[in-house]
Amino acid sequence: MSLEASFPRLRETGYRITSPATNEYNCIAWAAGESDRWWWPDPSGISYWPEGAPRQETLEAFLVAFSTVGFELCSSEVPEGGVEKVAIYVNAQGEPTHMARQLSSGEWTSKLGKSEDIEHQFDSLDGSQVYGSVAYILKRSL
């Protein structure tokens, strides 16, 4: 399935592919600023997950994991100087499915599973069948 078929709003809002496909890292690692390992709270411990964060596919576990690298809850996706923001997406059951990171330009960057990284508008992936909706915005000082 094509990128635009999976995320119909990308066609409307525009996007740019910024890297080749790779399975070296996923969207969670990319949101944390890493591109050398896969982040996921799998119970078996195969993927990296921050020490002290529950190995559960829950919003709470993701909030704890990102607090270990300096993120805290934020009320807005509006860019702020000296601040990096990430968005956590959830499906209809409230389970985390995706994360995106805000760039200094105000655009957002996402790693699409084992596919490419893209730059996109904040709401371009929101409401898709694939990732669901943004549940939380987090921020940390740069």
Protein language model regions, located:
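Generic structural motif recognizing short loop/turn segments at the entrances and edges of beta-strands
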Residues: 11-13, 26, 82-86, 105-106, ...
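Short amphipathic alpha-helical surface micro-motifs
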Residues: 10-14, 68-70, 115-120
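...with weaker cross-activation on analogous glycine-rich loops/strands in unrelated enzymes
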Residues: 53-115
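Aromatic- and glycine-rich peptidoglycan recognition patches
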Residues: 102-142
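Ribonuclease/tRNase effector modules and their secretory precursors
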Residues: 1-9, 15-16
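Cysteine-nucleophile protease catalytic domains, especially the papain-like/related folds used
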Residues: 12-65
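Domain-length accessory/inserted modules outside core catalytic folds
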Residues: 21, 37, 45-48, 59, ...
